[in-house]
Amino acid sequence: MYIVYVDESGDIGLQNSPSNYFCLSAIIIHESKWDQTLNSIIDFRRFLREKYGFKLREEIHCSHFIHKPAEFQRIAKSMRLRLLRDVIDFQANLSNYQIINVVVNKKNKPIGSDIFNLAWQTLIQRIENTLQYRNFIGSTNIQDTAMLFVDKTDEVKLRNLTRKMRRYNPVPNSFNLGAGYRILPTKLIIEDAIHKDSAHSYFIQLADVNAYFLSQKFQPNQYIKRKGGKNYLDRLQPVLFKQASKKDLLGIVIR
């Protein structure tokens, strides 16, 4: 089984929204590599404590960490950004660790579009397809499944979506099949998504960093642009699951 940790960045609003994009970033790890990966993360958090004075019990929540630091004001802003770059580089060197990114461009969507469902359905479908073709690394099983662990989001809406996809899931035909859709219910995503407070999950905190820099790649704020953080996501290339999209060099699925 694969464990999938997901976090969001941006918002789903189509009117008067500060963001033009809604982003999801998912970390995928096989259960057999989970403990090994967790131990690596704990060692890395100890490194952050020694280098920056960032405690193991403290939460990385990017937008607050950079722009509304509160208790983290003890760490200079430039050093906080460097800490986040270290988080990116740490992940890029992990083995048996992959990331799928989904971005919904809200600028070209008509009023009334369901941005939340579009993003999550796209991500879930990519995970389902990859499980079917056994393209995730870290397993020799004949067939694996996956469970979703997500930061706080619209729990009811996500639950309704995943349950619906198990019964009715229209998927556009590939080019060789012509126009139209096929009904391909998902079978490999186990149970409803489990919602976790990111304060209690190092993995979701990593997904938060990835989702933040995913959104900054498309719509960077002035500070990130000035400091060169717009392309921090590119540093994750060794662990990006680029097969998720052939249309983007980093494999980002853009809708």
Predicted feature descriptions by range:
Residues M1-R255:
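Phosphate-ester processing/binding pockets and catalytic centers
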